């Protein structure tokens, strides 16, 4: 089984930490503006491409493990644990908010009080449009900074759905993972 550990770091936004030796074999891929495709889109959206469309960039792997650029792996069993009992997609539940409705409300509340981090990434209009599109605030909220997924036609199509919606609504992908689970486009299980 071939495993790819993937992250993105454009404009040296994060300090990508060294990956400790793991208990399973893997290849590490860090995408930057130097090795990302040259698409006409914002850097923020372009940085989502390896996260969501990995199967086009690295088609010869069986499993992809995603980590945000700011995440530091400290355990030698990290990859072994996250791929253990993997169905299609494995993510942790969000540690602070339970549902995507909670997340939409949190983001909108923060944008209304001029949170600069959110205002430079999203628009209120697109957040509202995405919320109306999903139309189910009770879906579980996942923490999308770390996940594992299979490279299979079904899962790839599900991630292509997320990519397509990110292009329509901006780059707020977090609630879209819950939507593909609801639509049964991919089978999820949670990690801790």
Report the location of each language-model feature:
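N-terminal anchoring/stem segment of glycosyltransferases
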Residues: 1-49, 53, 57-63, 154, ...
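Short, surface-exposed beta-edge/turn micro-motifs
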Residues: 2, 26, 89, 143-145
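A general structural signal for short secondary-structure junctions and capping/turn motifs
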Residues: 19-21, 55-57, 82-85, 136-139
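Core catalytic alpha/beta fold that binds nucleotide/phospho-ligands
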Residues: 30-38, 44-53, 74-85, 113-134
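Conserved beta-strand termini and adjacent loop/short-helix elements that scaffold enzyme active sites
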Residues: 31-33, 94-95, 191
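Short beta-strand-to-loop acidic/aromatic patch adjacent to the donor-nucleotide binding site
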Residues: 62-72
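Conserved donor-nucleotide/metal-binding helix-loop-beta segment in metal-dependent transferases, i.e.
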Residues: 73-113
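Catalytic core and acceptor-binding pocket of nucleotide-sugar-dependent glycosyltransferases
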Residues: 115-192
């Amino acid at each position: 089984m071939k495993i790819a550990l993937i992250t993105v770091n454009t404009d040296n936004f994060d300090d990508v930490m060294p990956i400790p030796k793991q208990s399973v074999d893997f290849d590490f891929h860090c995408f930057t503006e130097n090795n990302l495709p040259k698409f006409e889109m914002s850097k923020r959206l372009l940085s989502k491409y390896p996260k969501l469309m990995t199967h086009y960039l690295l088609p010869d792997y069986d499993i992809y493990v995603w980590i945000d650029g700011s995440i530091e792996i400290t355990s030698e069993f990290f990859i072994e644990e996250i791929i253990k009992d993997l169905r299609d997609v494995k993510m942790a539940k969000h540690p602070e908010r339970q549902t995507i409705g909670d997340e939409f409300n949190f983001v909108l509340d923060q944008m209304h009080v001029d949170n600069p981090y959110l205002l430079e990434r999203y628009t209120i209009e697109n957040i509202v449009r995405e919320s109306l599109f999903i139309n189910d605030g009770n879906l579980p909220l996942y923490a999308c900074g770390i996940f594992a997924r299979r490279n299979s036609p079904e899962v790839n199509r599900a991630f292509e759905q997320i990519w397509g919606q990110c292009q329509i609504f901006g780059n707020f992908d977090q609630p879209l993972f819950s939507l593909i689970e609801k639509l049964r486009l991919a089978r999820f299980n949670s990690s801790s």
